[in-house]
């Protein structure tokens, strides 16, 4: 299984070479993925990757894993689970075109609940019954019926009218990722709980502390160490760092190179 998601981290601008006021804090997305095997109801963790960066940075990391044949697509049934973010699925279709794709079941359910609340009233029995029936139809491979039913709705309000259009378009866009019953019978996960757990353990626990604001470069270095710890490669990473440090001691940088930053890990 390969699952991808983003998590927000508190950051502030990198220090300027010129003196001035300190930049104000903001939030940036930490993009991440987790690769694992399924053994019945147990997850066997293989690796996690989390960094503040672009979608292309994440795609490059996945490409390196693919080229190293760490995901032997000819010997495993690769399945990808994620929410509806376009930056995720665009890269997945380029890198792993034969993998099974799953729209996170709980993310899909949230969209249906939001529409039901606007159309039938929040917390009403009618809203819950409609959501339950729609999810059951998705499990029974009746996604076309769900989409058609949404399009036939007579909006109860302007908000409902807007959500009817959005939800129908959303389900149509991800229609090939909605065969939840077939996927579950095949032993695949249909939720992205694995990456959400990794986001919490690797990112949130360390970066989201009271009063903590991180320079993106420092946050990424910390995330590399956190990933190494949970991937079981922390010892190798530190050994590599010590070797590089020894080389710098034996062969100190020239005057021209002395201003270059040291390797992060």
Predicted regions and their residues:
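Catalytic center-proximal scaffold of phosphoryl-transfer enzymes
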Residues: 1-265
């Amino acid at each position: 299984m390969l699952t991808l998601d983003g998590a927000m981290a508190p950051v502030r601008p990198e220090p300027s070479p010129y003196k001035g006021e300190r930049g104000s804090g903001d939030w940036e997305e930490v993009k991440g993925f987790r690769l694992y095997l399924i053994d019945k109801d147990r997850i066997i963790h293989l690796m996690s990757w989390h960094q503040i960066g672009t979608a292309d940075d994440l795609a490059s990391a996945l490409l390196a894993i693919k080229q190293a044949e760490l995901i032997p697509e000819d010997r495993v049934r690769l399945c990808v689970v994620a929410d509806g973010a376009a930056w995720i699925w665009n890269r997945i279709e380029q890198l792993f075109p034969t993998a099974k794709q799953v729209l996170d079941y709980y993310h899909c359910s949230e969209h249906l609940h939001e529409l039901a609340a606007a159309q039938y009233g929040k917390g009403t029995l009618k809203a819950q019954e409609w959501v339950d029936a729609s999810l059951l139809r998705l499990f029974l491979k009746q996604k076309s019926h769900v989409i058609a039913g949404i399009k036939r709705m007579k909006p109860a309000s302007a908000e409902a009218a807007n959500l009817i259009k959005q939800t129908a378009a959303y389900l149509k866009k991800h229609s090939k990722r909605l065969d939840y019953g077939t996927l579950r019978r095949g032993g695949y996960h249909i939720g992205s709980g694995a990456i959400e757990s990794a986001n919490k353990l690797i990112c949130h626990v360390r970066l989201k502390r009271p009063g903590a604001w991180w320079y993106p470069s420092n946050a990424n270095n910390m995330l590399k160490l956190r990933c190494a710890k949970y991937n079981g490669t922390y010892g190798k990473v530190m050994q590599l760092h010590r070797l590089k440090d020894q080389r710098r001691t034996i062969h100190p940088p020239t005057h021209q190179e002395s201003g270059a930053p040291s390797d992060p890990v």
